[in-house]
């Protein structure tokens, strides 16, 4: 986080972020290593210059080449032996002043262009200000805090940004930068993902202010890139064509649409002009093949004639197309009609894939990138040694020193809470390493199921009647043991086919069987039926549904059935377990509501779809039952637009459920990046207050607002081998860190609340941005850890508190409610939901939950 990027818009001083209330002391100490490396920075001032490059809007890569060439070219007159560092946009830093007038200096820079033509750039350099690293030392040691007005200055004058640019300058020239990571093309290894994509490995690097020092956070990182290959091969991969020569016919419409979707927006280079490898961006794929696709060609005598692409290539380049029956790529601007046959194009190397990966690609990616904690630790250490920062001439220029051993940190393993079950003997479960067992225990409050139905959307061949019968018998046995008795056989059990049959069947059930509590739906693998079941059940008719994959019906296991019962009991109003009351923190002594909030955005490149905001609120004192609210809002908008009305609904609902008004509101907010802290806090805190005042003028409960972050690159490792847990050698569940690698004076901490099963555990990062309730560090860390044990869908502690997790589920479910049957396939992992042309009212209505479902945990 930039030093002090919090506070509020206009840096209103009343919105300064709470200072750390002290350090946590609870739990058993554990020695850890963090992938943070100390950077020693001199107490000096550096010089910031503004760089203006014309023509504007060049990619950063080009800007860097321009600046690099400029430094070489004007070495004698301006730069001498200085080694400036540059951020790829507007900011250039030097350790010594440059001999340029205060009005700035204009320079001409030439880069070799394509086809022997030079490209000329005009560069203006102008001094802006000194950036002080003295101040940085004062802040890091906690001797001074930035003045709130400092926070509104441009990022370039921020001393942390300057440190970041110095350490990023050389890698940005050497590798392909993506966000805060660097990648290089795979040499000597090959990790295809299918569909023309492959895995590139690289590293993440970012600078963070920590206690007493600056830290460089380094992590191994992987992402999907498009494979550099002929477009014909790319097409074959995307369309699963094994041999292009066996495809003598033009592409079918559905194939062409699929191919267009994948290649649109990618850069290709041509191969038919010798060494002139001109690059183009694809804007479309033609409907007609190269043998029929025409364009107006101007002859030398000024006459214009229609030519097909195939004819033109034969006449102009003496090139007989091998695949004239395949379509052409339309490149450049759509109105210009530039067509290229597929066979003369290659995919340009180094293009990152921002489109969503398919399920298969995602699982291949996870397999290729998951590393056990000790392996990852070793890999990061190797990376830092080979990066050899201290020999980087730019790091030397600014007199930095980067330590090459990981930061040693003392963490604490918090005690796990005990969980109260029900039944006659009211047993208590004590988690061990984040896991506990329900065998021999009964739900705290089990529901009795008297009337239920089964709808099987798998075929009779996939799931025979006796298999169904076996499944229901097993389910009834397990549910009885768990204290959720399912009485008798289902009142209805029928086979059906396809999403179109869901609504008529459910309507029939609702009208025929009064008091029907549950429909169990059996699905044949990945299918649009799921989205339709949830749309009809959650939004249209208000019926509880539980989907089961056919493979889990054919081959049942007690574990799967038990997990089904966890979900069913909660959907029907039961309570699986509660935190043992006497060990909960003191915040529970008065009525308190826990809110979780999340905004999910449409996949990249999908500009038309809305973002979805979800807020859930606890409805009892345990807290175990939650109620959901959900809204659609403008795409990519991070602030929850309608938060005041959502919180108001939840407060009213809490009052109806408990007959109390909460005196405290604990708000866990997921999915905010550090650059947005101030903006989101300012808007949302006021919205929560507004919700309270709208209910009663004098109603002012204490609000605690916490951001939960999972998407960061801090990893923690056990320093002592003996403390490693499980097959992947991770840190134990409950590991907490609030010193050394955390903020110099703001209230943040890392907590790894789950047991890592695969790969390296990622601790969640909690940032308390507002706290009227004056929590101590211990109280708040323990509360957060306990809430990670209240997630109803499994008997494990999860990686973020239950309310934040539920908000995520609610938003994700709303994506399914938005699937528009006419236009969307809801296929693959792409729940698409552009409600093509549906207006905002229609979208808002589509995610509205039926009043019978509203008060249930339908999302469980």
UniProtKB/Swiss-Prot annotation:
Its main location: cytoplasm. It is found in: Cytoplasm, P-body. A divalent metal cation binds at residues 598, 638, 670, 808. Residues 530-567, 758-805 are annotated as: Interaction with guide RNA. GO terms for cellular component: cytoplasm; cytoplasmic ribonucleoprotein granule; nucleus; P-body; RISC complex. Residues 230-349 form the PAZ domain. One of its GO terms (molecular function) is miRNA binding. SUPFAM superfamilies: PAZ domain (SSF101690), Ribonuclease H-like (SSF53098). GO terms for biological process: miRNA-mediated gene silencing by inhibition of translation; mRNA catabolic process; pre-miRNA processing; regulation of stem cell proliferation; regulatory ncRNA-mediated post-transcriptional gene silencing. InterPro entries: AGO3 (IPR028603), ArgoL1 (IPR014811), ArgoL2 (IPR032472), Argonaute_Mid_dom (IPR032473), Argonaute_N (IPR032474), PAZ_dom (IPR003100), PAZ_dom_sf (IPR036085), Piwi (IPR003165). It catalyses: Endonucleolytic cleavage to 5'-phosphomonoester. It comes from the Eukaryota. Gene3D superfamilies: 3.40.50.2300, paz domain, Ribonuclease H-like superfamily/Ribonuclease H. Its EC number is 3.1.26.n2. Keywords: Cytoplasm, Endonuclease, Hydrolase, Metal-binding, Nuclease, Ribonucleoprotein, RNA-binding, RNA-mediated gene silencing, Translation regulation. SMART domains: DUF1785, PAZ, Piwi. Residues 518-819 form the Piwi domain. PANTHER family: EUKARYOTIC TRANSLATION INITIATION FACTOR 2C (PTHR22891). Required for RNA-mediated gene silencing (RNAi). Binds to short RNAs such as microRNAs (miRNAs) and represses the translation of mRNAs which are complementary to them. Possesses RNA slicer activity but only on select RNAs bearing 5'- and 3'-flanking sequences to the region of guide-target complementarity. Belongs to the argonaute family. Ago subfamily. This is Protein argonaute-3.
């Amino acid at each position: 986080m930039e030093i002090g990027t919090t506070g509020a818009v206009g840096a209103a001083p009343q919105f300064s972020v709470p200072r750390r209330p002290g350090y946590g002391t609870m739990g058993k100490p554990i020695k850890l290593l963090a992938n943070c490396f100390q950077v020693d920075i001199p107490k000096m001032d550096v010089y910031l210059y503004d760089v203006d490059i014309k023509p504007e809007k060049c990619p950063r890569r080009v800007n860097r080449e321009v600046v690099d060439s400029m430094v070489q070219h004007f070495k004698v007159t301006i730069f001498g032996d200085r080694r400036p560092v540059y951020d790829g946009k507007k900011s250039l830093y030097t350790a010594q002043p440059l001999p340029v007038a205060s009005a700035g200096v204009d320079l001409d820079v030439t880069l070799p262009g394509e086809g022997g033509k030079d490209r000329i750039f005009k560069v203006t350099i102008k001094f802006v200000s000194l950036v002080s690293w003295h101040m940085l030392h004062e802040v890091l040691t906690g001797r001074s805090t930035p003045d709130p007005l400092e926070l509104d200055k441009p990022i370039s004058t921020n001393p942390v940004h300057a440190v970041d640019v110095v350490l990023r300058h050389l890698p940005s020239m050497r590798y392909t930068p993506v966000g805060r990571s660097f990648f290089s093309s795979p040499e000597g290894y090959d990790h295809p993902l299918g569909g023309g994509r492959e895995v590139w490995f690289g590293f993440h690097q970012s600078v963070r202010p920590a206690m007493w020092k600056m830290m460089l956070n380094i992590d191994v990182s992987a992402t999907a890139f498009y494979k550099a290959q002929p477009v014909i091969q790319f097409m074959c991969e995307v369309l699963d064509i094994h041999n292009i020569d066996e495809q003598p016919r033009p592409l079918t419409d559905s194939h062409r649409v699929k191919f267009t979707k994948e290649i649109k927006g990618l850069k290709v280079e041509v191969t038919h002009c010798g060494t002139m490898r001109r690059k183009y961006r694809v804007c479309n794929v033609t409907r007609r093949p190269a043998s029929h696709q025409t364009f107006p060609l101007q002859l030398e005598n000024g006459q214009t004639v229609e030519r097909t692409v195939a004819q033109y290539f034969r006449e102009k380049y003496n090139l007989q197309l091998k695949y004239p029956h395949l379509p052409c790529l339309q490149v450049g601007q759509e109105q210009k009609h530039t067509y290229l046959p597929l066979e003369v194009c290659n995919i340009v190397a180094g293009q990152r894939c921002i489109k969503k990966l398919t399920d298969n690609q995602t699982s291949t990616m996870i397999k290729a990138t998951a590393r056990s904690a000790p392996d990852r630790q070793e890999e990061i250490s190797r990376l830092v040694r080979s990066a050899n920062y201290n020999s980087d001439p730019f790091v030397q220029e600014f007199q930095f020193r980067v330590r090459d051993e990981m930061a040693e940190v003392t963490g604490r393993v918090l005690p796990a809470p005990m969980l109260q079950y029900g039944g006659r003997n009211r047993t208590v479960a004590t988690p061990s390493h984040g896991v506990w067992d329900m065998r021999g225990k009964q739900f705290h409050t089990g529901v009795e199921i008297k009337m239920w139905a089964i709808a099987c959307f798998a075929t009779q061949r996939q799931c025979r009647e006796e298999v169904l019968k076996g499944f229901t018998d097993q389910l009834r046995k397990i549910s009885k043991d768990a204290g959720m008795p399912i009485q008798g056989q289902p009142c209805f059990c029928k086979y059906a086919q396809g999403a179109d049959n869901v609504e008529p069947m459910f309507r029939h059930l609702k009208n025929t069987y009064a008091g029907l509590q549950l429909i169990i739906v059996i699905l044949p693998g990945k299918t649009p039926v799921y989205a339709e079941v949830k749309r009809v059940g959650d939004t249209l008719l208000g019926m509880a549904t539980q989907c089961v994959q056919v493979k889990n019906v054919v081959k049942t296991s007690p574990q799967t059935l038990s997990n089904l019962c966890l979900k069913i009991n909660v959907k029907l109003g039961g309570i699986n377990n509660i935190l043992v009351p006497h060990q909960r923190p003191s915040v529970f002594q008065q009525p308190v509501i826990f809110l979780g909030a999340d905004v999910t955005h449409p996949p990249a490149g999908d500009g038309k779809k809305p973002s979805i905001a979800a807020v859930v609120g606890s409805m009892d004192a345990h807290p175990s039952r939650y109620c959901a609210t959900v809204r659609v809002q403008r795409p990519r908008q991070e602030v929850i637009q309608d938060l005041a009305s959502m919180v108001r609904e939840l407060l009213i609902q809490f009052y109806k459920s408990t007959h109390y008004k909460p005196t405290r509101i604990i708000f866990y907010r997921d999915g905010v990046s550090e650059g947005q802290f101030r903006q989101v806090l300012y808007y949302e805190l006021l919205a929560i207050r507004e919700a309270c005042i709208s209910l009663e003028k004098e109603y002012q409960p204490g609000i605690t607002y916490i951001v939960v972050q999972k998407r960061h690159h801090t990893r923690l490792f056990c320093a002592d081998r003996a403390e490693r847990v499980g097959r992947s050698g991770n840190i134990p569940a409950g590991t907490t860190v609030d010193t050394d690698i955390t903020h110099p004076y703001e209230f943040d901490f890392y907590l790894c609340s789950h047991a890592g099963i695969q790969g390296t555990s990622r601790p969640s990062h909690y940032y308390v941005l507002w706290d009227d309730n004056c929590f101590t560090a211990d109280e708040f860390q323990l509360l957060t850890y306990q809430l990670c044990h209240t997630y109803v869908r499994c008997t494990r502690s999860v990686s973020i508190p239950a309310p934040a997790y539920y908000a995520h589920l609610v938003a994700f479910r709303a994506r399914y409610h938005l699937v528009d049957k006419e236009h969307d396939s809801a296929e693959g992992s792409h729940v698409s939901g552009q409600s093509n042309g549906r207006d905002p009212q229609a979208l808002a209505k589509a995610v509205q939950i039926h009043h019978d479902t509203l008060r249930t945990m339908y999302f469980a």
